[in-house]
Each structure stands twice: as C-alpha cells, then as structure tokens.
Amino acid sequence: MEKKVRFKLRKVKKRWVTVSVASAVVTLTSLSGSLVKADSTDDRQQAVTESQASLVTTSEAAKETLTATDTSTATSATSQPTATVTDNVSTTNQSTNTTANTANFDVKPTTTSEQSKTDNSDKIIATSKAVNRLTATGKFVPANNNTAHSRTVTDKIVPIKPKIGKLKQPSSLSQDDIAALGNVKNIRKVNGKYYYYKEDGTLQKNYALNINGKTFFFDETGALSNNTLPSKKGNITNNDNTNSFAQYNQVYSTDAANFEHVDHYLTAESWYRPKYILKDGKTWTQSTEKDFRPLLMTWWPDQETQRQYVNYMNAQLGIHQTYNTATSPLQLNLAAQTIQTKIEEKITAEKNTNWLRQTISAFVKTQSAWNSDSEKPFDDHLQKGALLYSNNSKLTSQANSNYRILNRTPTNQTGKKDPRYTADRTIGGYEFLLANDVDNSNPVVQAEQLNWLHFLMNFGNIYANDPDANFDSIRVDAVDNVDADLLQIAGDYLKAAKGIHKNDKAANDHLSILEAWSYNDTPYLHDDGDNMINMDNRLRLSLLYSLAKPLNQRSGMNPLITNSLVNRTDDNAETAAVPSYSFIRAHDSEVQDLIRNIIRAEINPNVVGYSFTMEEIKKAFEIYNKDLLATEKKYTHYNTALSYALLLTNKSSVPRVYYGDMFTDDGQYMAHKTINYEAIETLLKARIKYVSGGQAMRNQQVGNSEIITSVRYGKGALKATDTGDRTTRTSGVAVIEGNNPSLRLKASDRVVVNMGAAHKNQAYRPLLLTTDNGIKAYHSDQEAAGLVRYTNDRGELIFTAADIKGYANPQVSGYLGVWVPVGAAADQDVRVAASTAPSTDGKSVHQNAALDSRVMFEGFSNFQAFATKKEEYTNVVIAKNVDKFAEWGVTDFEMAPQYVSSTDGSFLDSVIQNGYAFTDRYDLGISKPNKYGTADDLVKAIKALHSKGIKVMADWVPDQMYALPEKEVVTATRVDKYGTPVAGSQIKNTLYVVDGKSSGKDQQAKYGGAFLEELQAKYPELFARKQISTGVPMDPSVKIKQWSAKYFNGTNILGRGAGYVLKDQATNTYFSLVSDNTFLPKSLVNPNHGTSSSVTGLVFDGKGYVYYSTSGNQAKNAFISLGNNWYYFDNNGYMVTGAQSINGANYYFLSNGIQLRNAIYDNGNKVLSYYGNDGRRYENGYYLFGQQWRYFQNGIMAVGLTRIHGAVQYFDASGFQAKGQFITTADGKLRYFDRDSGNQISNRFVRNSKGEWFLFDHNGVAVTGTVTFNGQRLYFKPNGVQAKGEFIRDADGHLRYYDPNSGNEVRNRFVRNSKGEWFLFDHNGIAVTGTRVVNGQRLYFKSNGVQAKGELITERKGRIKYYDPNSGNEVRNRYVRTSSGNWYYFGNDGYALIGWHVVEGRRVYFDENGVYRYASHDQRNHWDYDYRRDFGRGSSSAVRFRHSRNGFFDNFFRF
C-alpha cells in the first residue's frame, strides 16, 4: 500500500536539503512550472519546469532534522524510500530568496522494487586507484598514491509530473503609458501587444519612440518590448550544494597541454582536461591525458548563455525541460549537472566524443556573440564583410606587420591619386576583395609572388621536366584589388626572362593580359611600357547597352563606333595608340551576376551576394538555358551574334571569345553548343580569310530607326581610297547591324556601304544573314550563289527596304548582315606574322596588324559540370580538340585557374570549385585532381595546344587565399572594402580566430621561395628596383614555406562572432594560457571557488544595479553582454540608462538598462538617430545599410530633401537615400535622383524602366505641359511622362500629336493612329478639322480630327459628300454604294444628288437623303439595276439594267 509522507524541509547553510532515510545522500530537486521555449526572454508570462536531481555528498546534511507526518495506514517493513520532491509553489524571478527557513513539500517514497532500478546510486565503491577528494567538511585532499577511491553518484533522474503554476504577470505599462500609446497615430494593439506602423502599413522594428518623455521600444518583431527593470534580488549561487560538480570539473593543470586552444587563447569551442570525469555518469574518476571535455559543459560567460546551453542540450539529450529568464542560477546549475551526467553516459555508450564535438559546435553557432550576428553590418563586401589585422597588437604580436599598405591601385600607387589619370575619378579600386587578403605591399610577399610567377611560367620544366609544357603568358586577376607594384614585378620579369621588350614576336608569343576594370588602368599600363595589355571596358559596355540589354534599356548604336579606346569612324592607323583586348562576356562577368539575379528573383530571395548552393545554381540554369532560347528574354543577353560580328571584325584590339557563348555554361565541357555556336564559329573562320585592313564605321538614320555599318577594306588597304592588290580585292568584310526589332526602312531609304576603291564592281555574298527563325550562315560562295550583290563603280554596296528590316527571334533582336567578297581561295589567310625587328619606342606590345591577327579563347566557364569520368575532365577534352581551336584561328588559349579548390563554401568560387578559391597556389592538380583534371592532364593539354602553335595562358591570382587549414588568433577590426573601420561594428581591435595558416606540409612548403636564389642570380635587376608603393625592393631573404596572418592584410568575416575568443567581460581581459600571464575562469583553477556562496550577474545593491562576472569580478567602465542584450556600468560600477556619452561616443540605454543597438531613436518629433551594432550613435556622413545609404549630421538622420555639399538629395521616411528613383516629394513635385550619386537631376532627360521619358527643370522638378527644349516643342503629361506617339488635347481643346521617336510636336504632317485613322496637323501643330485641300486633294476631317475615309459627311446645310475610302479624296461624278447597301451619286461639286437627275444619259431619282430610289417609269417594272464600277480614283461609272421580275411594290424599284 502506498505510503504518503508529509515532510518539512529545513534550511542548512543557505540551501534547502532533504535526506534519504536509507543513506546520507541528499536528493534535491528543483522547482516546477510551465513549459517554455528555449530562447524565451519574457519573464512575466512563463514559469520554469525542471526535474533534475543533484546529489550532494556532505555529512552535514544528515545533521538536519526531518519532520514527517505519516498519512498511510500500512507500508512494507523493508521499504527504503528515496525522497522525491515536487514543489507546489510557482517559481518567480525571486526564486533565489533565502529568507524563509522552512518549506513544505509532498514526498512520495519509492518502494524497494523501484529502488532496484537505481544502479547502486547510493553506494561508495572502493577502487585500486587514489584520487583527489573532498572531505565531509569540504576540505580538498590530494590523492594518496597508495590508495584510491572513486565516488559513484546516481544516474537516475526521478520523473516528476510538474505542477503547473501561473506566474503573476507584472505590469510594465501604467495607465499613463497606455494612454500615451493610444494617443499616437499608427500605434495599435493586436492580440494583446502594441505595434507601431509606418504610413505604408509595414511595422516599425527596432524602433525607440519617445512619448511624453518616456521611451518605448518596439523590438525586432515590431512588438512593444518589456522595459521592466531586472529583479532587485542578486543571483546568489549556493555553490556548495548546487554546483557540487565544480571541484571535479577544475582543470587538471594550467599547462597549455591541458587545453585545446588557438595561440594560447580559449575559444567558445575550446576543450580542456578536467581533474575528474564522471565516468558513465556515475563515478568520479581521475582523468587521463585523453579525457578532454568542452569548456561550455562546465563554464559559461554569463547566466543567459548558460540558460541557452541548458535548453539546447536538454533538447539534444531528450530531457524535456526548458528554462526561461526567471530561472535562478541554482536551478541552472542543477540542470547543467544533469546534462553533464547524461553526456558522460553517452560518451561511454558511444565510446567517443565526436558526437559531442558536433553538438557543442552547433550550439556555439546559435549564440550571437559567437556567430555572424555580432559581425554586422553586412553587405559591404563580397563575403558580407572584411577584417583588417592590427600592425602593433601586444596580444597577437605574431601577426603584426610593418606593411599592410592598402589600396595602392595603379591610380593610387604612391598613396595619392595620380594626376595623370582622370578618366576614373575614384582611386581606381579597393583592397579587400575575397578571403585571406594577401599583403602585396610586404617585400617578402612580393618576392614570393615573383617566385610563384616563375613557377607558373616554368611549370612544365619544374613539374614534368618538359619545357614544352610551360605556360607562355599570364592573366593577372583582380588588378584593382592588389598592390600595383605587382604589375612592375610581373612586367620586369617578362622582360628579363622572355625578352618581350625586344621585338613584336617575343611580345606576342608571351602576350599577357590584365583583369583591370578602372578606366585609369590602361593609360597607366601604357605609361609603364605596355608590358601587358588591358581590356577595352568602354567597348564592352557599348556592346552591352547597345545590343545585349532588353529593348527598353538599349542605348543608341553610335557608342559602338566612338565609345572605345579607338574611334572607329575612320581607323586607318598602322599601329593603334594603345594595345588592348576586347570581349562581351567572361567567366565572372555577365554570367554569375545573371545567375544571381535568377536565384534572387525565382529561387531564394534572401540570398546574399554570391553565396549560392549547388542546388540553387542547378535550378537557376534550368531557367537560364530556357531563357537563352526565348525571343523575349528576361535574364540572358540579346544579340550575342551581333556583338561577336563586331568583336571579330574590329581593328585595333585583340578579340577574346568566351567559352560560354559557344557552349552552354553548365553541362560537361564542350558537350552542348549554344544557339550562337554556328554564327560565332563562322565568324572565327572568316576572320582568318577576310578580316584585314583599315576600318570605317558609320551610323545611318533610316526609316523609323538607325543602323550601323562597319567595313574592313582588306589586306593592304588602310583607307577607302587604297586600291591594294589581288589579296586586297578578295579580302575585307562589311557588317550591317540594327538594334530595333521594329526597324522598317522607307521605300526611298538607301543603305550605302563603301567597301573601298579596291572593290569597285565586285561581287559580294552574305556570310551571315538574319531570317525569321534566326541567323543563316553561308560557308561558301556556292551556298550563297543566289544572293550575290555587286558594288557599283564607286565600290559601294547598296541595300534597300527589301534587304534590311528588323527581326525578333531568339538570336536577333534587330538586324544582322555580314558580307564578304566572292572569289577568295579556300585557304586564303590574311593574318600577319609578328616582326622580329627590334622595338625602339620603349614599348613592349604594339597594336598593329600582327597583334590584330591574334584571337584569344577564354576556355572555361565558372559553372561547367564536375567530370564524372576521366574523359570528361576539361584538360583531357582540350587536348582532344586542339585541331578545332586551330581551325578557329585561336592563337592564345586562356586556361582556367588550375589550382586545387577550397570547398569551404564561403563564396561562389569555392562552391563551384572554379580554381580561384585555393589554399595552395602551387598545387596545380599535383596532390589530387582539381575540377579540370590532374597535373599530368594539364601537361598533356599544354603540349597539345603548343603542337598547333597555340600559346597557353596561366591565371595568376595574387589577391587572395581561401580557408587555410590552420587557425590563428589575430587582433582585428571590422572594415569596409577600402580598409576603413565600419561604423556600428562590435569588432574593434578584437581578438578573432582566422583560418590564416597553411599546413607547412603542402606544395607551398615544397616550392615556396624555392626559386628566389636562382632568380637573384639570373636577374639581379629585379631585386634592385625599389617598388613604388613601399620605396624598398623585394625581400628574397625569407622563403614563405607556411602562410600565416603576418603576410595578410586581413580576411573576410568568418561567422565566428565578436566574442568567440573568450574573455572576462567585467575586466575585458581575454583568457590566456601564456605561461607568465595565465588568466582563466576562476571556476577552473580555484579549489575554493564553488565551495561558498558567490554573486554573479546583475545585482541591486540598494543604490543601483551592479554586475559581477562568472569569475567574480565587478564590471566598471565596461560594456557587458547578457545573451543578446548589452549594458554599461560606469566608473562606480552602476548600470546606466538614457543618453550617455562614453569615451567620446554617444549611446542610448533604455530604462531597464538595455542598450539600443541596430535601432532608430525617434525623439517624438520625427527627429531620428541611429545606434549601430556596437551601440554607437551614427554622427556625421554617409553610412551603408545593406545596399542602401543613410546620411547623418550631428547625430541626426537625414529625412526628405536634404542639401549636402551643394547637391540636393532625398532620403525617405526611414532615412534611406533615393538612388535611381523617381520621388514625389512633400511639395507634390516629382523629382529624380541619380542612380550613382543620388543627386537631384536638373536640366536633363531621364528614362524610367518602362521606357518613358521625363524632363527635369533647373529646380529638379519634372516639367508638365508644353515645353520648348533645344528648339523642339515637347509635351509632358500631368504625371511628368513625355508624350511620344500620343495624341494630346491641350488646354485650349486643340488636338496635337508628338513624334514617337523624338517627342517633337508634329506639324504639317499626316499621322495614323493605332486604329488606322488618319489625322493632319497644320503648321501650328493643331489637328485640322473640316474641309482642306492638300496636294490638290479635297479632304475632310471630322470634329475629332479623324480624316473621313469611306464616309458620308453631312455638311452644315444638310448636304452630303463622300470621301474615298483609300485616298480620302472627295468623290465627284461617281456612284457610291455604302455599307448599308444604299446607292448615291455625287455630282461635279461633290454633293450627293437629290430628286430627278439625268445621270449618264438616264433619268434617275434620289430621295431627300440622296439615296437612289428608281429610274424612269418604263424601266422600273421591267429592268433590274446592275451597277458595276471601278473604284479607282477619278474613274467613270457604268450603269446597265437587265430584265427581271421582282417582288417590289408597284411604282417602286429598289436597288
């Protein structure tokens, strides 16, 4: 029979205890309550649920008397009940109150059979090994070597059904508060919570609003936050009972070997060796050197982190209890002990700790201090953000540097903008691009870069002892993101080792290129000797906006002629001023950004930057490839073939063909051709045969649009007047292009293409022509025999509307025609070989006919598929297709970066493993295959290309290195891409763990610095030159065998958080294992810490709130984080509230002490301030928020129209700057703000995304009504949109029409509307009405301006006229039959006849409406009228009658 006992529990040394009648072991259970969420912070609405058991081995517990009232009638004599305690009192945030001395509990004893399941939980087991121990009085006794014992504790958690208690909810809102909230517009109460809505109906989030002097805060959900002050009762931890594990959990010794650390610093993922482990969850056993446990199992930086840990681990271990912020430290310690017991049980069962490592790491990532939340703001960098390393940190001196000279771009190489270069008004680039940013200003690093360059250029020799497998040249990646000294180093090396400055042949054989986007880079390179060539970015943009963009975004076509490094109106120079290469797309340009756009729009709108998954990429390409085949494209490029028709026929630049324009970007290498493959291949082959000579381009306005023509005169002819020789006559090419699919030429239009004097009276045939279905290629004279055209005696090809019109199909949105001479030999080759004559002008590369003859092939795509078998590797496929590349005329093959890729997934490059995200720069498939094959495959591919005379280009990527395998602690500051500290960041001279060390066992260890001695001996001049950015030469004295932080400027943020390296918050001191300066959490090292009561956390001392860290230190002049909340404690150690100035910065703290972070403060009058991620108020200047900007002046956020440095800008109600936006401002005026600067536009036209045009006056206001601008009379509707192709009725009621192209008011011209109706506008631009004589024709225009055609018009006197349905001319002397079947006859004055008349010799009758009724009496009964007429203008009528009987009334003959 069950026995129910009533116990009274007494207090012993500030702890509640009850004693088992069977032993001296005390079982203490904690308080019960309701189930809450693990991340709950609402103290008012939630209680705590627990059933953890803590066992305290102290004899003093047995001294306490226990009073029980027996309420049962019988019990077993052998029962040894274990007390199980259930609290009947609901827990509140004062659960640690220790003033009461007794408490009543219901205790349900267990039976003997139940106790048999407890695995000897109350036994002391003797062992053969001595261990350190605690005496009954709490004294710590070292182990005796001759004896040993282990202490066994219970592993049984007695299940308790919690008694649910409802907490009394403290009211944080007074009646005055409620009234104040109710008086504010847009604050509404929804489901018991208050929310503040913006005018557009969206919620204000992270928004502090001052109402009548009191601040109300609306949190990240938009709900009004609870500003209740913390409990005034301190967190008193009864460590001698509730933290009884502490003595065993102390560290074995403070030697660093007993910790997992990074550079002697502890991190959130550090493990350590405790003195004891609770083996199998039962027995405290002295640890071995293999027994490491996570630090977070026994120590936490604050109580909130401990609570989060307990809740997280409970969920992982199947313990169904959670704890809210009202939970006491006593309860959390008990829960943590239960978790530790469970962990040890599982370690024994699993026989490893791998699972625990994964679990702890996963928990760490949930804490804002240890994840990317504390690294905000984001989006100012390709990988969310960058970190700059300190040069003079005392804490991480191993990472210090004397260099880290940032942003030394070609424009800014000396640290000041070079006045010679003004095309780009910026400094021409920025330092931080990706990953570990290499410090290319460091002379030791510069020497290593040279060493690596030499390795690449001699790869075959070094790796395979085969010089035929050496690379010939390089592509320099990301020039605008590295120190420009590297350009001198590379150029000097190419001159010294390859002799590129000696003659054109040497230069062309080692033709190296730059990826340098700034407009200043090309002139800089030219001034440096043209040792390498750069892209013609202006031409790329011209191709993009004239041809590739959607129709409503296209510019005119003239930029294709003039917006380039070369004006091609008449390009007849032997040698261009500046050499260059040109392209329309590349592996990372106009490909990955299109994929990003698709992912954001249709797959994952929350994607940041270029951090895609492979699954997202796969889905995006399904859309991309489908779009490529569409006539109306949403994402992909239009008119790719048109771009290549110009690229491959232009003079004075080396064209580069992109792999992804011939083969699909995804899929196996060269497996799937694109729709543009045939057109590009045809152009490549034709280039060998025809493309040579001078060039002339023209823009012609024809019909309703424009076209451009481009002519190459042929080999030997630089000008149109040159007659050349036989080869001249059979070479040359004409390209005709339009970018308007609605292009229509007028009948009188002629497109005249001057092929030059060498081509008079010559047959030409099409190479490419546009058809309804796409582009038709003609590969021979025979194929195009029926389409031959001849030049006239001036050498002109002439085309008409019959030849040229606009098309819309998947390949062409506009028009393309390419024409070549008939009669060229099949093997004609007009290319020019490079000269070996010495170069004497101080330049290495010259853009002459020989360089023009070259073609580069960028032979890879970022997104090509991973090989599934050996034969699919890129380099294997390349080797098999070298004949094809030679047929195309490829002279320079740009290989993919051949480096084994990182797989960290931190950026697109490491996801797709394209070779740019490497950890070992010397591993070209040596250690294992990369995406493109093995090092041996690379050797074979290079040799195969060389066998066809094709030069091979390596990708030199000196900017970054990814995810190095070894970790290092650095002192870092969160910066933007220029290295400027980011406002609002928590990371300022903060210790941070980076992936900054290479292994020391890789190819870097083998080859790093290995060639420097050889290079010094061969080319000593390279090491004598003082570099521009540093003023000192390279330093070859150090060979970098292992990369480390001292060689980097910094890295991208890694998501480890601002607090990952652990410290004591109160003293702001990092926990360190440095032998002479060891500083560790006290609970790990102090044998007395944990055996007496201690105070931690927020404590009210009667005067104010103070804070004690878990190490027992009081916070003074310190910021303290408790979970996600931050507080500040002043010089006296008291928590502050309200506005505060601390160390020169402004902060704001709510009434409960919580600091405003990432929040707006509204003073109640819509004057806004912003407090950043570090709590500092933003003071002056522009600040980036994601992709948007805000502006602040003296701490006030700009809202509305704001004048800044003389320019007017606009900031919306949330403070975000308008860029590229049309804004109706508070005065009701429409304005536009520039897409780049954000400045208000004035005296300028602007086109919106719909293709509509606006004109903004000198005040920046959109004009409306009629305006004369540059001699044109224009009209702008009330919404500011310019009328184009529209009929507008002016204020006087006059109808006017505005030209669809120019928008100019139409005068003295006919216009037809969409219904086919015609209007005539007079010399004043007004639609005419009534009768008009125009060009000898008498016409009529109705009152709405519509011309009468095929209509009866009744004039004022009721007389009727009729106007021809085709010409609109007034009909005279003709019969007319209307649609109703009635016949009329119009006399020589144009009026319809009425009454009896003799018409064409017959007497006929017309009624009062002019309708023909009958002829003379003798005809009307016997003849049926048969009318035949010619509808031709001015024709005569013919009438005949035939005999017929009909059913008409007598005397009435109806027709």
Swiss-Prot record:
Keywords: Dental caries, Glycosyltransferase, Repeat, Secreted, Signal, Transferase. Changing residue 1398 to I: In strain: MT8148. Residues 64-121 are annotated as: Disordered. Changing residue 1424 to N: In strain: MT4239. It is an enzyme of class 2 (transferase). GTF-I synthesizes water-insoluble glucans (alpha 1,3-linked glucose and some 1,6 linkages), GTF-S synthesizes water-soluble glucans (alpha 1,6-glucose). GTF-SI synthesizes both forms of glucans. Changing residue 538 to K: In strain: MT4245 and MT4251. Cell wall-binding repeats lie at residues 184-203, 205-224, 1116-1135, 1136-1155, 1219-1239, 1242-1262, 1263-1282, 1307-1327, 1328-1347, 1372-1392, 1393-1412. Changing residue 734 to V: In strain: MT8148. Residues 65-104 have a biased composition (Low complexity). It comes from Streptococcus mutans serotype c (strain ATCC 700610 / UA159). It catalyses: [(1->6)-alpha-D-glucosyl](n) + sucrose = [(1->6)-alpha-D-glucosyl](n+1) + D-fructose. Production of extracellular glucans, that are thought to play a key role in the development of the dental plaque because of their ability to adhere to smooth surfaces and mediate the aggregation of bacterial cells and food debris. GO terms for molecular function: dextransucrase activity; glucosyltransferase activity. Changing residue 1326 to V: In strain: MT8148. Changing residue 1113 to Y: In strain: MT4239. Changing residue 727 to I: In strain: MT8148. Belongs to the glycosyl hydrolase 70 family. This is Glucosyltransferase-SI. Changing residue 1439 to I: In strain: MT4239 and MT8148. InterPro entries: Cell_wall/Cho-bd_repeat, Glucan-bd_rpt, Glyco_hydro70cat, Glycoside_hydrolase_SF, KxYKxGKxW. Changing residue 597 to D: In strain: MT4245, MT4251, MT4467 and MT8148. Residues 1-34 form the signal peptide. One of its GO terms (biological process) is glucan biosynthetic process.
